A protein has these predicted regions:
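Nucleotide-sugar donor-binding/catalytic module of glycosyltransferases
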Residues: 1-130
Length: 131
């Protein structure tokens, strides 16, 4: 069983989803990345399939008719096999050091006398200018 399942809901995300996926691959075999293509009309499905072929033990591509963000998240939940679950939107990315620390903390909690059902961490919103 994977430690963490991460669902990436995607709709016409070809221009930015790779940055998101690449930032999550740092978790290696500890995580499963579920790329949920929500009926995109661009290259989103193709990119998802490429990652699933390249990283078959980490990435799974899920394709469905467009049902909206919530249904894409639900598809991720239905397909998740990890102990913990996280949603990262396709236009977001995670900081490598913070991500590794989160995984380390989850493992330490699992080995201790008590575990957690939910882990909450800080986040930073960075608005990139169009310059």
């Amino acid at each position: 069983m994977k430690l963490l399942s991460i669902a990436i809901p995607c709709y016409n995300s070809q221009d930015y989803m790779e940055s998101c996926i690449e930032s999550l691959l740092v978790g290696g075999e500890e995580v499963e990345i579920l790329i949920v293509d929500d009926g995109s009309s661009d290259r989103t499905a193709e990119i998802a399939d490429d990652y699933a072929r390249k990283y078959p033990t980490i990435v799974k591509a899920i394709h469905q008719e467009n049902g909206g963000h919530g249904e894409a998240v639900n598809a991720g939940i239905r397909n998740a096999t990890g102990l913990y679950f996280k949603v990262v939107d396709s236009d977001d990315w995670v900081n490598k050091e913070a991500y590794v620390q989160i995984l380390k903390t989850l493992y330490e909690l699992l080995r201790g006398p008590q575990t957690v059902d939910l882990l909450i961490s800080n986040f930073v919103y960075e608005k990139r200018s169009e310059e």
